[in-house]
Amino acid sequence: METKIFAHRGARWCRPENTLASFQQALREKADGIELDVHLSKDNELIVIHDETVNRTTNAKGFVHDLTLSQLKTLDAGCNFKLQASSPLLTFIQRFRSLLIKKIYTHEKIPTLGEVLDFLEANNFTGCLNIEVKTDHIHYPDIETILSEEMVQRELSFTYLYSSFNFRSVELLHELEPTVDLAYLTYNNQNEIERGLEADFITALHPKKSYALSKHFESSRKPLRVWTVNAERDIKKLLTKNVAAIITDYPEKARRIRKQCQK
């Protein structure tokens, strides 16, 4: 079984995370899957952003659920971007590149989920879209229903799955879409892992990398898609364990390593 490579918030090592620019780069790097995060705006639009607030990734402050879509669309989702250094020796060069890239992607906008779906369709994406429902800190009323309605109305060229740290959100999505692929996100809490393994409707676990890399871990009854795996040694080790997928900020690098390790 070939381990799939999922682009974490797109190719966020070199583009502003969870933006169309980041997803475009993930397609260029030939990621097998793309992972993104969804929240609800004040006017119940599905917003693709990781944090509960816009503070870290934009030029404004405030909670996503306190802002309307039109307000969110005025924000700059590229202004705080910094290129991730993959090697200390390349830091100076990458800082220079980061300044150039930041200039290019300043004024990048926060997308809606609908815009991302349209973009992936227009670019003939045929992989898997991992939609993380961000209800672990704030539970948005009816987000699961709004999300499911958005997805089932479309005839997509690609597959999709839902994931969440919130067990109840995963349950609700199963009730709405009984045959959809559902993943339970976990840290290293063994009780959470067992809960995910025992629930029949959960088809996969998305554990933190330290769990899958642990010497105590040998195999799992369900597929594992492991997050967030960026170091070459960790990618290689997980490839030897034949996990279902690696979720990484560096999809092209991970694909290159996979080619070497899983011939």
Describe each region flagged by the PLM.
Residues 1-263:
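Phosphate-group recognition and catalysis centered on beta-loop-alpha active-site segments
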